[in-house]
């Protein structure tokens, strides 16, 4: 054990010396990085004792339906909202969907991007209640320059938009535990953003946290910019202020699509996030069971700003470290990350709120884009609202082949988005394209044979069909 400690010390000393010479990042970033790596090397990650896990009670994970209605008085509503800040995590690129630049500028519906919809929502909120809810965007070094240009188009809106960067940390070369940028990798590939757990120190280091506190702001609503369901909810805000909860995680019931999502547990008297990576191998199936662990983290988080300041200043936010091994130009590297949801256990009176599924509508792939661009949803004041004509509570399951993976290819294969209000499942593979006015119902599978181009004609109605060629339509 002593030998391992010595090895860890020499690793950290070598890394510290090399990082000190990196001119691209601030002293705060260097200190944060070294602190993260030291925690990782000390192996302080505690194993969860499975027998100590308890299912949270309704006091800890509050059912949304039991929340008190917000005040009806407009002045009282304004007073509540004036304590709020909205923060969107804007560090991700649209590369997985074949787009360049920040993911938040992908067009979602009616020509509006994720960012457009967010701005329209907050504008209508500020106008309706006469309040001043600011929007913060946490960028990464990957999205910063593009985002700065993009937000200029909102300069005439009635909202204050602040941008700040999350930390930039060097990737570590696995072989000798030195930073990749100090070994000649001068481009962006030498660096990484260390996960959204970094939102708390970065908010503080940027000076934004002090500014917001001086303006009388009390809570920040943090959400992924690609979650179209993450809209301001006055009922939740009212509950947190009334009960002085320093932290709230929105959770929602698991479906079979969400079995890998983190869940909330009661553990040694505190509420905490349990991720699949922390689960001992022999309990993974139990973790995935919808019977025992019924809820998962939406990553919609509401956090008290004074509490963030207190905990960041005390360096108390020691979230579980997620090691993420990668390869850059054939070199094996390690990046260490943390998640914002894991911070829940450090805050006082932390709770979960079990919210309707409508508050979790992420767009991670073109199959999600098909859902939100279809007649399953409508757009009102920037809000994506579910069509009441859909009887089933769950959305249809949609699987699109690799031909649809990139947004440009996806759009080229649909003359118009089909009607899917009565669809249960859709599976498409091969060279398939859709005409306009197509209606899909029940369970539909469309598989074009290799080398065959399959076109679904205009106005086709497909109900419970298995299509392998034009003769099956």
From Swiss-Prot:
Its EC number is 2.7.7.9. It is found in: Cytoplasm. UTP binds at residues 89-92, 103, 166, 195, 226, 364. Keywords: Cytoplasm, Nucleotidyltransferase, Transferase. One of its GO terms (molecular function) is UTP:glucose-1-phosphate uridylyltransferase activity. Its main location: cytoplasm. Substrate binds at residues 91-92, 196, 224-226. Pfam families: UDPGP. One of its GO terms (cellular component) is cytoplasm. It catalyses: alpha-D-glucose 1-phosphate + UTP + H(+) = UDP-alpha-D-glucose + diphosphate. GO terms for biological process: UDP-alpha-D-glucose metabolic process. Disulfide bonds: none annotated. PANTHER family: PTHR43511. Plays a central role as a glucosyl donor in cellular metabolic pathways. Belongs to the UDPGP type 1 family. This is UTP--glucose-1-phosphate uridylyltransferase. It comes from Hordeum vulgare.
């Amino acid at each position: 054990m002593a030998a391992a400690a010595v090895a860890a010390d020499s690793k950290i000393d070598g890394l510290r010396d090399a990082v000190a010479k990196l001119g691209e990042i601030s002293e705060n970033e260097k200190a944060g990085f070294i602190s993260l790596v030291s925690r990782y090397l000390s192996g302080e990650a505690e194993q969860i004792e499975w027998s100590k896990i308890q299912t949270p009670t309704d006091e800890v994970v509050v059912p949304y339906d039991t929340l008190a209605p917000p005040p009806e008085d407009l002045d009282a509503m304004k007073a509540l909202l004036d304590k709020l800040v909205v923060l969107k995590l804007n560090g991700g690129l649209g590369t997985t969907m074949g787009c360049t630049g920040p993911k938040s500028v992908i067009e979602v519906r009616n020509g509006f991007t994720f960012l457009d919809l967010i701005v329209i929502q907050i504008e209508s909120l500020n106008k309706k209640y006469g309040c001043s809810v600011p929007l913060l965007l946490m960028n990464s070094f990957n999205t910063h320059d593009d985002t700065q240009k993009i937000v200029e188009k909102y300069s005439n809106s009635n909202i204050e938009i602040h941008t700040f960067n999350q930390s930039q940390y060097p990737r570590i070369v696995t072989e000798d535990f030195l930073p990749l940028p100090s070994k000649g990798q001068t481009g962006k590939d030498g660096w990484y953003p260390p996960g959204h757990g970094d939102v708390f120190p970065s908010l503080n280091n940027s000076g934004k946290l002090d500014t917001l506190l001086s303006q009388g702001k009390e809570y920040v609503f943090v959400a992924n910019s690609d979650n179209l369901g993450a809209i301001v909810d006055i009922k939740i805000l009212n509950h947190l202020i009334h009960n002085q909860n320093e932290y709230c995680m929105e959770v929602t019931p698991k479906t079979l699509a969400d079995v890998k999502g983190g869940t909330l547990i009661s553990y040694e008297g505190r509420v905490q996030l349990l991720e699949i990576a922390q689960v001992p191998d022999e309990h993974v199936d139990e973790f995935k069971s919808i019977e025992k662990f019924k809820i998962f983290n939406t990553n919609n988080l509401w956090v008290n700003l004074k509490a963030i300041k207190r905990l960041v200043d005390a360096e108390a936010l020691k979230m579980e470290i997620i090691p993420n091994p990668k390869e850059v130009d054939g070199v094996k590297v390690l990046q260490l990350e943390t998640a914002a949801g894991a911070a829940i256990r450090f805050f006082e009176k932390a709770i979960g709120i079990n919210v309707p599924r409508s508050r979790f509508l992420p767009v991670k792939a073109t199959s999600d884009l098909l859902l939100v661009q279809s007649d399953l949803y409508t757009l009102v004041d920037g809000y994506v609202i579910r069509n009441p004509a859909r009887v089933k509570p769950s959305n249809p399951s949609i699987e699109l082949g690799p031909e649809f993976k990139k947004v440009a290819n996806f759009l080229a294969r649909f003359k118009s988005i089909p009607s899917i209000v009565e669809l249960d499942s859709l599976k498409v593979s091969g060279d398939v394209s859709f005409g306009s006015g197509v209606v899909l119902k029940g369970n539909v599978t469309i598989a074009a044979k290799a080398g065959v181009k399959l076109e679904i004609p205009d106005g086709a109605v497909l109900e419970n069909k298995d299509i392998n060629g034009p003769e099956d339509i």
